[in-house]
Amino acid sequence: MKFFIVLLAALALFTPAFGKTFTRCSLAKEVYALGVPKSELPQWTCIAEHGSSYRTNVVGPTNSNGSNDYGIFQINNYYWCQPANGRFSYNECKLSCNDLLTDNISNSVKCARKIKSQQGWTAWSTWKYCSGSLPSINDCF
């Protein structure tokens, strides 16, 4: 019996975090609750849909410059967050990239809004899928 309890405890400690998967509407509601205007919700849901499939724990494949993109909005670690491996980053959002991989998306939203204010929607490579038609969020509220 002790072995079984120890085994369960060990599995609980070493089980990888799977992150949260939002739906279009659950993401729209959460982002709105974090202060994003309703008029921007279609853009944010589109970026999340095409960048991470609405998943919080996604680390994208390595880019041509050796960087990676993190979290639900696929935020780049060369410019915006500090990677755990200590590699150089401008870290404009002043946070660890791991902070963008949690179920609490407040850091992701704050950083993404900073990116948008400095570079616009085209900062996201997935914007090409959004610029012509955006998902409706009318049925979400």
UniProtKB/Swiss-Prot annotation:
GO cellular component: extracellular region
Pfam families for this protein: Lys (PF00062)
Cysteines joined through disulfide linkages: 25-140, 46-130, 81-97, 93-111
CDD domains: LYZ_C_invert
SUPFAM superfamilies the UniProt entry points to: Lysozyme-like
UniProt-recorded name of the protein: Inactive lysozyme 1A
Glycosylated residue positions: 65, 104
Superkingdom assignment: Eukaryota
Family: Belongs to the glycosyl hydrolase 22 family.
Organism name: Lucilia sericata
Function statement: Shows antibacterial activity against Gram-positive bacterium M.luteus but shows no activity against Gram-negative bacterium E.coli. Likely to play a role in the eradication of ingested pathogens during their passage through the intestine.
InterPro entries: Glyco_hydro_22 (IPR001916), Glyco_hydro_22_CS (IPR019799), Glyco_hydro_22_lys (IPR000974), Lysozyme-like_dom_sf (IPR023346)
GO MF entry, a single one: lysozyme activity
